[in-house]
Amino acid sequence: MASSSATAVPLTREQVVPSRQRIKLPAWLEVAKPRLIPLLLATTLGGMALTEGWPLSSPRLVCTLGGGALAAAAAGVLNCLWEQELDGRMQRTSGRALPSGRLSPTAAFAGAVSCALAAATLLVSGVNCLAAGLSLLGLCSYVLLYTALLKPRTTQNIVIGGVAGAIPPLVGAAAATGHVGLGGWWLFALVMVWTPAHFWALALLLRDDYRAVGIPMLPVVKGPVVTARAIRRYGWATVLLSFLGVWALPEGGLLYGLLLLPFNGRLLQMVERLGAEPDSTERAKGLFRWSILYLFGICLLLVFSRQSGAAVFDLQLRGWLAALPAGLPGINA
């Protein structure tokens, strides 16, 4: 097969994300996992755009995103603290800040507590208590539910534990209106079903690492064929659920739906290719990278569809579509 050469050597995380090779972060910043934060903030913005409270005032927007970034940083540090012994046993992760000794656990814990307190203060004082509480829930679910409880015990760890990454849209909705409406819950559900396909693509690439330390990721326990089938199911579920954004948006939904088509087409193409070649590292790597761009794109479309010009265009498009049947031969015959 054409992809046989791609299956010989499993890729490292650094090969999957080349920026890890180019950018060396200070130890105190490395443990905060800053590369994960932009996507969390993007889904927070998406949650805001799905409410009648959009756009937010600049101070509230800054406080929400700043608080969310600090809460995510605290969660990242606590995750590194919990897994430092595990990281030290794997060649790929043994050079990280905590297992290598470049940062002490005491300093890391102090940083995590400081970030969590700063996040809570910023969100309570600058946004509202619901947004602060949801951010704290996201932090706890990542560290306790996913990292400590589910990750070492079940192949479905990311399916259930994915709730941690799905909470930012709820934070965004709460920040905009003081409550979480149907739009926020829709984006929460979308991120939940997007997460397994995204993460299992990465786990296919790193399954030897997970196997070496006894972490029961799906590719380790069930193999690449079963994993590719599961990815396909969740990929299709993501596509189908994404179209509900047409109705979840207060305005601009039709424009969102039209612009969504190429994103979904590409996602389906990549999950089907992986299904045809489940052992291909290149297929898994491509899907992992595209899945990140896909979720960024969804959130960008949500925000774009709420701009005034986009809303006007959406109304014009709806009028044109409503008038279209009258111009078709035989419709009024």
UniProtKB/Swiss-Prot annotation:
Protein's name according to its UniProt entry: Protoheme IX farnesyltransferase
Catalytic activity, EC: 2.5.1.141
Pfam families according to UniProt: UbiA
Main location: membrane
Pathway recorded for this protein: Porphyrin-containing compound metabolism; heme O biosynthesis; heme O from protoheme: step 1/1
Single GO BP term: heme O biosynthetic process
Source organism of the structure: Synechococcus sp. (strain WH7803)
Family: Belongs to the UbiA prenyltransferase family. Protoheme IX farnesyltransferase subfamily.
Family matches, as InterPro entries: Protohaem_IX_farnesylTrfase (IPR006369), UbiA_prenyltransferase (IPR000537), UbiA_prenylTrfase_CS (IPR030470), UbiA_sf (IPR044878)
Source species taxonomy: Bacteria, Bacillati, Cyanobacteriota, Cyanophyceae, Synechococcales
Function: Converts heme B (protoheme IX) to heme O by substitution of the vinyl group on carbon 2 of heme B porphyrin ring with a hydroxyethyl farnesyl side group.
GO molecular function: protoheme IX farnesyltransferase activity
CDD domains linked: PT_UbiA_Cox10
PROSITE patterns registered for this protein in UniProt: UBIA
Catalyzed reactions: heme b + (2E,6E)-farnesyl diphosphate + H2O = Fe(II)-heme o + diphosphate
